[in-house]
Amino acid sequence: MGRARRFQWPLLLLWAAAAGPGAGQEVQTENVTVAEGGVAEITCRLHQYDGSIVVIQNPARQTLFFNGTRALKDERFQLEEFSPRRVRIRLSDARLEDEGGYFCQLYTEDTHHQIATLTVLVAPENPVVEVREQAVEGGEVELSCLVPRSRPAATLRWYRDRKELKGVSSSQENGKVWSVASTVRFRVDRKDDGGIIICEAQNQALPSGHSKQTQYVLDVQYSPTARIHASQAVVREGDTLVLTCAVTGNPRPNQIRWNRGNESLPERAEAVGETLTLPGLVSADNGTYTCEASNKHGHARALYVLVVYDPGAVVEAQTSVPYAIVGGILALLVFLIICVLVGMVWCSVRQKGSYLTHEASGLDEQGEAREAFLNGSDGHKRKEEFFI
């Protein structure tokens, strides 16, 4: 077992006073807590010691030291100090079976003793993380984390991208130690493949701020994807073109198939795995080339349209943006501009027509008034004749 640190908490002081002859002598002990494999010091403090016999015994009441002399052949126990003020022994490589009460006995006419209680804690080892079944994109994955031995029972936590995941924990006592397990379940996608999940274990046997961690790398299986990359954008007769089929997938497709539409590949073509080499291009090599890949989760296919130009032809390199998309965007912009222009013309015509109508109406009224003014007398006569 690896080397562990020694831990001591605020200790309960136990006092005993000898009565009768030899009164005034006192023995004081301190409780000790240590991590398994660590070093513990058990101390008996003496007050007004007069040289009486001092005996140190283990929890089984076996004498370890008698007045400073070794009585039990266990080299893990060493006498560090024997003085009128203090008796101190050192225990290395502490074990669970060492736990219990250690007796400091002072023999005068009456026997007096105090007990120093040794508590042994067990730090958790690195957790064991396992997956219940293979993770597939769109499904759920269930992970389990196990710490088979700790004391007190370890606390388990899950982390993903520095965020804590909620797990379900259970514990079982096995003698003096505890076995603790935790499970976590969550949905995964292809982007989660290779992600890190951490299971962390902590208890009081570890130094403050320390923990034991195990990282689990997610293995998420998903259907393949394929894309063809050309060694050059513009090819002319006599050039050599290399097409590369970039494939992803888990499990990775182990076979890639090259085709040219409904025709066979040119005799000069050399297909090796992900690459297709077309040397000495001629116009007869024109066509749609495809690469195909598959795994148990699906199938992928990529297309490349080969156009071989004359050596002296002036052409522009193909862009990565499909012409159909660019054409669609331009058509939409033209349509919007036409709609705006039509709306502006319609509003202008309507406003102008309304203005002309009002203007003509105003002229008619003014003309009638002027005519009435000029022919006022005749009109009056006509009105008189009408009424007569």
From Swiss-Prot:
UniProt xrefs under SMART domains: 4.1m, IG, IGc2
Protein modification: N-glycosylated.
Phosphoserine: modified positions: S361
GO cellular component: cell leading edge; cell-cell contact zone; membrane
Ranges of residues in domain Ig-like V-type: 21-119
Function: Involved in the cell-cell adhesion. Has calcium- and magnesium-independent cell-cell adhesion activity. May have tumor-suppressor activity.
Name of protein: Cell adhesion molecule 4
Taxonomic placement: Eukaryota, Metazoa, Chordata, Craniata, Vertebrata
